[in-house]
């Protein structure tokens, strides 16, 4: 069996400096 892909939570956008 193939391992299930781990669900990565959406990352917040980087603050524009």
UniProtKB/Swiss-Prot annotation:
It is found in: Secreted. Antimicrobial peptide active against many Gram-negative enterobacterial and plant-associated bacterial species. Not active against other bacterial species like H.pylori, P.mirabilis, B.pertussis or N.gonorrhoeae. The keyword Secreted applies. Transmembrane segments: none annotated. Its main location: secreted. Keywords: Antibiotic, Antimicrobial, Immunity, Innate immunity, Secreted. One of its GO terms (biological process) is innate immune response. One of its GO terms (cellular component) is extracellular space. The keyword Secreted applies. It comes from the Eukaryota. Belongs to the apidaecin family. This is Apidaecin +.
